[in-house]
């Protein structure tokens, strides 16, 4: 496939190595299918044709030129420039280089056309051709002046005599990237024409010129390349992707080489070839119907068509007839259905074909109603689309100057690669946006209004290359707002435009859209009139759209783009849309854009100059940072009443009305100071509470560092949060984002930030598909006061918006808008999106105020509960109150929750006395149930611990256990509550517990939980309360000391009891030391007796061990080798007085050799070794061997 591309007036014929149907020709045979390089260099510099297997594209980072290829020195710098132009990411490899046809679809789609949305209509994906173009080697720019005389480079010449001519004459990319070049072709200037004048007629001013401007023609070249290799190409029509008849191909090409370009024979051949493939999908191929006939003259100022062109297109003289002819091929309704709209005579440009692409836009002439937000709405009515371009009340060029200047003033600092802008300059010269591709005004398809989008939108905010998705039909969400603003600003003279001028301007839009010409980054003033006129026609269509909707007329469908950026910066793409269905409809930001004061003043001055009338700043599309919008402006009724420029307005406005908001307020009604639309308009009541101020107040950063995120830094306090508002989600991470009463474009810094700020959106903006992780803006309740910005917090305010309007919550066409995190955003795990993101560490610096509305959910989550606990410890009283207000009503639910109970406990620890008492009131009536519950018992314990005991609520809580003491004592949870009651409550209030223990002391002492309660009673109760308990204990001492639980009660008495109680227990032990010491549980009691008994009682117990005999051995020997009793012997050695200790050691000496055989005997020897070494005594024969075996 040979394709010709003009790059900044340089011509190159190159062979696509990705085309599998090409064959390799022998060296020396010059054929148009081979790469022919034209040069003005010396004759004789013969370069052999490069075979297809080695025609690697030189621009790719992994491609390298081979010997004799087109590569030259300085290629790496040009590669960097090409990468800069086309945003190729590092590491992206050109797929299929040198591999024949196997390389298709191996690389990322960089210039997708959207054709792959309709797979059944796809002939050849434009992505592949665009990818090939992107990989084209841009090695040089010098072509000489050989094309300036009008010579066609595709004509036959004797180039084989002079050898190949190379255009790669060295590196000439030294000047500014988008700067002035030598005689390049720029965007043709589109100006208004007199009626009946064709586009191809050259006249003084009213003609289409292609002058030698000072701006690059890169965009023209790109579209030339894309369209020349479109599916309408005869090569593809005949060969598609399959193998071709090589011989026939060669004969065909050689035959064509000997003919003139526009000869009638060739034109006939082209038509025959086109007819053979036009119906490849059962649909006529309109775009590129004569693909080989070049429609654009490369010679500056030469736009005359040849006779063949006139013969080909001369029959189309009436614009409406031509449009009907094109649209009816798609099965559209005849134009007679819209008889109410006058049909003007429109002459189509014979240079460029106008028509829809049936490969992509195969839509039926009907609307598809849907009743859910997830379903797409078929909103492009291609049958009545022409009517939008035949409205008589078009706008003039000058009326869009104000909106353009305001938009450029706001986004000037965002053009990072354009050096002419600075922070404080007013927008004097307009620089069109880089590569705005087919953004669509209302009522048109995305292919037909790329220029209109550029005129109304201004510089692009977020490059579509960042997301790697198809950019066709993608536009920022404030496109509607800007169009409506421009329409209202120019509405005072819209009705005064004559019909011929309107039709001329609309022709221009249609013509430009049909040719699919993307805008290049540096079109100069010559393209400004084009932008202005195109914008005027776009706003005219918006007016017609608004009028039709307000009047309820049929045939005015709503706009549903295939993809666009919503107000949060999220790219909404409906990839699953079927034929006839557009994308999901999302609400756009309704209010004005905040700009700096200097830029606002410049914009106001420009608006006043363009509108020739009073221009107010209050209701304009832009507002100053330090200005407040007035409460309302009366709109007097006039004789010339037009429909409101609002898209969804039903109010009647004077021609001098200053309101240019998206949602205009009704006449004479006061507006809302915090919103851009009135509360009494068609959508005011509903959207006031549903939408709120979904604004993005980007901080006015003054830093000039080139960091990737410096456009969202928080170095300014202009947007400091007021006391009545709450910081939105993500404020801690993007701390430069705050509240604003009027939303603006996401990611667009203010002009004072300078050109160094990055256009790259935050990383989280593309991580969740159609919704981002950043909640920008606040929520208002309809009166201008901010309410909680947390997800779900708007639910209780939605009841106020019950009006049955288009955007009401009950509407099936447009679901009501909600915040980024709503209570209905439930993830598959059952958690809300906010909690899920928090659990995934997406909010490392989340604050309590940012989860308002989700406190209950967080409290019942493991990580969320821990987060709240940690925050409550250091929270301010206001933050604690915020949390407390949400948990109070459901306090009992949290008290019995596995994680929520900890939040309640934290309030008992760190909350105010009022909060503690309020929670205690929630416990009242549920003490027993909570005491027996695993988690509720902990809450009651905290309440008993931290509420002052003199509070009446404590006594009331404890009294609820009366009659259920034993049940609670024997319960694994309730016993802790009873213990805490005994510890914290005044003993006088616990008499009912003592009374309940009567005759139950032994049973409770041997109970695993009751024994603990008995010990607490012995520790904290009054002596008169513990006496009956001790009496019962003494009666069962012998049994209790051997019980696995009762022994703890006896030990507790020995440790904390009165001396007389200890003596009673020691008396029970004497005489049974040997037996009890060998008992697993009683041995512990014997140890406590030796430790806590008096000196006399201790000596008696030790003497009993030393003098008692156990059969042939002494009791001491038996105890030393016993697994339990040896600890009693060790304790005796430790606590015995020196004289008695010496006696014990002399008793142990005869058994040293034997004790070494026993595991437990070694413990005794180690104890002896310790004392003898400590005291320096010589053990004599008692000592072990020198190696110190222990």
Curated annotation (Swiss-Prot):
Residues 38-74, 491-531, 611-675, 744-777 are annotated as: Disordered. Present in oocytes (at protein level). SUPFAM superfamilies: ARM repeat. Residues 865-869, 937-941, 1011-1015 are annotated as: Adenine-nucleotide binding in RNA target. Residues 975-979 are annotated as: Non-specific-nucleotide binding in RNA target. One of its GO terms (cellular component) is P-body. Transmembrane segments: none annotated. GO terms for molecular function: mRNA 3'-UTR binding. Pfam families: PUF. Phosphorylated. Phosphorylation takes place at the time of dissociation of cpeb1-a from pum1 and the translational activation of ccnb1 mRNA. Pumilio repeats lie at residues 850-885, 886-921, 922-959, 960-995, 996-1031, 1032-1067, 1068-1103, 1107-1146. It is found in: Cytoplasm; Cytoplasm, P-body; Cytoplasmic granule. The keyword RNA-binding applies. Residues 901-905, 1047-1051, 1126-1130 are annotated as: Uracil-nucleotide binding in RNA target. InterPro entries: ARM-like, ARM-type_fold, PUM-HD, Pumilio_RNA-bd, Pumilio_RNA-bd_rpt. Residues 1083-1087 are annotated as: Guanine-nucleotide binding in RNA target. The pumilio repeats mediate the association with RNA by packing together to form a right-handed superhelix that approximates a half donut. RNA-binding occurs on the concave side of the surface. Pum1 is composed of 8 pumilio repeats of 36 residues; each repeat binds a single nucleotide in its RNA target. Residues at positions 12 and 16 of the pumilio repeat bind each RNA base via hydrogen bonding or van der Waals contacts with the Watson-Crick edge, while the amino acid at position 13 makes a stacking interaction. PANTHER family: PUMILIO HOMOLOG 1, RNA BINDING PROTEIN PUMILIO-RELATED. Interacts with cpeb1-a; interacts with unphosphorylated cpeb1-a but not phosphorylated. Component of a complex with papd4, sympk, tacc3, parn, dazl and cpeb1. Sequence-specific RNA-binding protein that acts as a post-transcriptional repressor by binding the 3'-UTR of mRNA targets. Binds to an RNA consensus sequence, the Pumilio Response Element (PRE), 5'-UGUANAUA-3', that is related to the Nanos Response Element (NRE). Mediates post-transcriptional repression of transcripts via different mechanisms: acts via direct recruitment of deadenylase complexes leading to translational inhibition and mRNA degradation. Also mediates deadenylation-independent repression by promoting accessibility of miRNAs. This is Pumilio homolog 1. The gene is pum1.
């Amino acid at each position: 496939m040979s394709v010709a591309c003009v790059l900044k007036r340089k011509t190159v014929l190159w062979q696509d190595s990705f085309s599998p149907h090409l064959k390799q020709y022998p060296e020396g045979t010059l054929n148009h299918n081979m790469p022919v390089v034209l040069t003005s260099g010396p004759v004789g510099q013969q370069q052999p044709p490069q075979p297809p297997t080695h025609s690697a594209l030189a621009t790719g980072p992994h491609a390298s030129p081979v010997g004799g290829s087109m590569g030259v020195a300085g290629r790496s710098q040009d590669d960097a420039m090409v990468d800069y132009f086309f945003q190729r990411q590092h590491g992206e490899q050109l797929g299929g280089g040198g591999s024949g046809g196997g390389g298709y679809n191996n690389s990322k789609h960089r210039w997708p056309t959207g054709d792959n949305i309709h797979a059944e209509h796809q002939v050849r994906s434009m992505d592949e051709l665009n990818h090939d173009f992107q990989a084209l080697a841009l090695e040089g720019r010098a072509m000489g002046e050989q094309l300036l005389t009008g010579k066609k480079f595709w004509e036959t010449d004797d180039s084989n005599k002079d050898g190949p001519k190379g255009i790669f004459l060295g590196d000439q990319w030294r000047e500014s990237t988008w700067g002035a070049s030598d005689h390049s072709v720029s965007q043709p200037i589109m100006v208004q024409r007199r009626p009946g004048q064709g586009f191809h007629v050259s006249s003084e001013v009213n003609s289409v010129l292609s002058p030698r401007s000072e701006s690059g023609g890169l965009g023209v070249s790109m579209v030339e390349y894309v369209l020349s290799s479109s599916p309408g190409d005869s090569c593809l029509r005949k060969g598609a992707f399959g193998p071709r008849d090589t011989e026939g191909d060669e004969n065909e090409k050689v035959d064509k080489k000997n003919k003139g370009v526009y000869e009638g024979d060739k034109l006939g051949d082209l038509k025959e070839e086109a007819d053979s493939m036009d119906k490849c999908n059962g649909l006529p191929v309109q775009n590129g119907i004569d693909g080989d006939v070049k429609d654009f003259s490369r010679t500056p100022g030469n736009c005359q068509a040849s006779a063949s062109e006139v013969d080909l297109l001369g029959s189309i003289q009436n614009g409406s007839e031509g449009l009907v002819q094109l649209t009816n091929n798609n099965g559209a309704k005849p134009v007679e259905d819209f008889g109410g709209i006058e049909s003007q005579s429109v002459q189509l440009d014979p240079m460029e074909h106008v028509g829809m692409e049936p490969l992509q836009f195969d839509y039926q002439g009907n609307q598809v109603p849907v009743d859910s937000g997830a379903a797409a709405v078929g909103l492009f009515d291609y049958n009545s689309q022409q009517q939008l371009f035949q409205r008589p009340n078009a706008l003039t060029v000058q009326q869009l100057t104000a909106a353009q200047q305001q938009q450029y003033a706001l986004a000037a600092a965002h053009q990072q690669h354009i050096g002419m802008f600075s922070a404080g300059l007013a927008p004097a010269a307009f620089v069109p946006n880089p590569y705005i591709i087919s953004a669509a005004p209302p009522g048109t398809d995305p292919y037909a209004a790329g220029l209109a989008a550029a005129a109304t939108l201004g510089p692009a905010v977020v490059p579509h290359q960042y997301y790697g998705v198809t950019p066709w039909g993608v536009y920022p969400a404030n496109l509607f707002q800007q169009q409506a603003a421009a329409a209202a600003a120019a509405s005072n003279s819209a009705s005064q435009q004559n019909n011929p001028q309107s039709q001329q301007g609309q022709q221009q839009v249609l013509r430009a859209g049909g040719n699919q010409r993307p805008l290049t980054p540096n079109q100069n003033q010559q393209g400004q009139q084009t932008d202005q006129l195109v914008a005027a026609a776009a706003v005219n269509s918006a007016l017609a759209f608004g009028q039709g909707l307000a009047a309820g007329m049929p045939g005015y469908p709503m706009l549903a783009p295939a993809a666009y950026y919503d107000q949060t910066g999220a790219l909404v793409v409906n990839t699953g849309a079927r034929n006839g269905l557009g994308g999901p409809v999302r609400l756009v930001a309704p209010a004005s854009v905040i700009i700096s004061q200097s830029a606002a003043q410049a914009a106001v001055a420009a608006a006043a100059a363009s509108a020739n009338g009073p221009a107010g700043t209050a209701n304009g599309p832009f507002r100053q940072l330090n200005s407040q919008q007035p409460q309302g402006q009366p709109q007097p009724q006039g004789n010339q009443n037009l429909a409101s420029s609002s898209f969804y307005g039903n109010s009647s406005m004077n021609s001098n009305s200053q309101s240019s908001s998206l949602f205009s307020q009704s006449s004479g009604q006061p507006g809302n100071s915090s919103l851009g639309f009135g509360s009494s308009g068609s959508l005011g009541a509903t959207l006031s509470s549903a939408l709120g101020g979904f604004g993005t107040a980007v901080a006015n950063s003054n830093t000039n560092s080139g960091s990737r995120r410096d456009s969202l830094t928080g170095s300014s306090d202009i947007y400091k949060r007021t006391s009545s508002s709450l910081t939105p989600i993500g404020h801690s991470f993007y701390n430069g984002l705050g509240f604003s009463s009027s939303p603006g474009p996401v990611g667009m810094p203010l002009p004072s930030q300078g050109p160094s700020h990055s256009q790259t959106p935050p990383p989280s903006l593309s991580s969740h598909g159609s919704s981002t992780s950043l909640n920008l803006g606040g929520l208002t309740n309809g009166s201008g006061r901010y309410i909680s910005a947390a997800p779900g917090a708007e639910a209780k305010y939605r009841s106020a918006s019950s009006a049955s309007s288009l955007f009401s919550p009950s509407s099936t066409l447009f679901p009501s808008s909600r915040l980024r995190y709503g209570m209905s955003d439930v993830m598959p795990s059952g958690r809300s999106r906010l909690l899920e993101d928090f659990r995934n560490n997406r909010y490392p610096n989340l604050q309590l105020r940012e989860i308002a509305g989700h406190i209950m959910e967080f409290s019942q989550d493991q990580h969320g509960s821990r987060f709240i606990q940690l925050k409550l410890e250091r929270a301010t009283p206001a933050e604690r109150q915020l949390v407390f207000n949400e948990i109070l009503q459901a306090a009992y639910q949290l008290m019995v929750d596995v994680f929520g109970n900890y939040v309640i406990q934290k309030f008992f620890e760190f909350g105010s006395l009022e909060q503690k008492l309020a929670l205690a009131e929630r416990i009242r009536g549920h003490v027993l149930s909570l005491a027996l519950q695993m988690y509720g018992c902990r809450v009651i314990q905290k309440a008993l611990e931290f509420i002052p005991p003199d509070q009446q609520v404590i006594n009331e809580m404890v009294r609820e256990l009366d009659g259920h003491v034993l049940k609670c004592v024997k319960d694994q949870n309730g016993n802790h509550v009873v213990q805490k009651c005994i510890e914290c409550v005044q003993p006088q209030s616990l008499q009912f517990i003592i009374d309940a223990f009567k005759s139950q002391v032994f049973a409770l002492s041997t109970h695993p939980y009751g024994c603990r309660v008995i010990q607490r009673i012995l520790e904290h109760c009054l002596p008169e309360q513990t006496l009956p308990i001790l009496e019962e204990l003494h009666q069962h001492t012998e049994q209790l000391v051997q019980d696995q639980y009762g022994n703890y009660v006896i030990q507790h008495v020995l440790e904390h009891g009165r001396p007389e109680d200890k003596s009673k227990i020691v008396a029970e032990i004497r005489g049974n030391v040997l037996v009890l010491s060998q008992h697993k549980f009683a041995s512990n009691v014997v140890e406590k007796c030796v430790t806590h008994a008096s000196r006399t009682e201790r000596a008696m117990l030790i003497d009993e061990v030393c003098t008692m005999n156990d059969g042939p051995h002494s009791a001491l020997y038996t105890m030393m080798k016993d697994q339990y009793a040896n600890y009693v012997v060790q304790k005796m050695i430790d606590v015995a007085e020196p004289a008695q200790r010496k006696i014990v050691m002399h008793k142990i000496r005869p058994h040293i050799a034997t004790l070494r055989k026993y595991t437990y005997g070694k413990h005794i020897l180690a104890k002896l070794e310790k004392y003898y070494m400590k005291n320096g005594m010589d053990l004599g024969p008692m000592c072990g061997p020198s190696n110190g075996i222990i």
